[in-house]
């Protein structure tokens, strides 16, 4: 989330509220939960999951997934991608424990893909995108990342067929968090930093 949301949100927030000193760290979801429960962080921006019910969650926006396919991939020739289309192509996937990866693997039924399918595990969406651009396989990218792409890169983007897998991005706080005005400010400013079209889940999207 951070590489694509922070450039849209942080500069304007810092300009409007220079007195607020935000300390930002990137963590996996399991580490976020521990840090919130221990009071080590005040809030977290994560993809909503059923296992986060012990926290307060404010919806920030809904972000759909896209396929990023190299010109040599059979996916590149499709106008939209069905989940069944993904089971015979090499995919670049984040390691287990990243909610971005885990939600898509579940939605697309990739765990049932043939054992002979080549899949690659590294740690960065940006790295995967460079590999796709070099002609190798396909990967998944979040909607906010598409606003940073060049025209050449946009030609590698393919939408999912309906229902489009979409993640709900939320602001998490502990149940005993008392700084209500700060929480509300963060929610409002983050929502203002993303396109209005992402504020609601559409009928063509499916929250995963």
Give the label of every model feature segment.
Residues 5, 91, 156-200:
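A late-sequence structural motif
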Residues 23-25, 58, 119, 158:
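General small-molecule cofactor/ligand-binding pocket signal
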Residues 52-59, 63-64, 78-79, 85, ...:
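Beta-alpha-beta core module
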């Amino acid at each position: 989330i951070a590489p694509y949301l922070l450039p849209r949100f942080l500069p304007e927030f810092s300009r409007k509220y220079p007195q607020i000193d935000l300390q930002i760290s990137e963590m996996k979801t399991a580490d976020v939960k521990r840090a919130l429960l221990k009071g080590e962080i005040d809030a977290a921006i994560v993809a909503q999951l059923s296992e986060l019910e012990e926290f307060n969650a404010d919806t920030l926006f809904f972000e759909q997934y896209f396929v990023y396919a190299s010109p040599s991939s059979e996916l590149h020739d499709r106008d939209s991608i069905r989940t069944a289309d993904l089971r015979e192509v090499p995919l670049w996937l984040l390691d287990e424990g990243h909610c971005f990866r885990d939600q898509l693997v579940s939605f697309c039924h990739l765990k049932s893909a043939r054992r002979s399918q080549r899949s690659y595990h590294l740690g960065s969406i940006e790295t995967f995108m460079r590999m796709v651009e070099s002609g190798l396989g396909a990967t998944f990218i979040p909607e906010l990342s598409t606003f940073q792409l060049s025209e050449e890169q946009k030609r590698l983007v393919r939408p999912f067929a309906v229902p489009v897998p979409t993640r709900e991005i939320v602001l998490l706080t502990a149940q005993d968090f008392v700084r209500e005005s700060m929480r509300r400010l963060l929610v409002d400013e983050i929502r203002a930093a993303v396109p209005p079209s992402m504020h609601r889940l559409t009928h063509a999207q499916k929250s995963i």
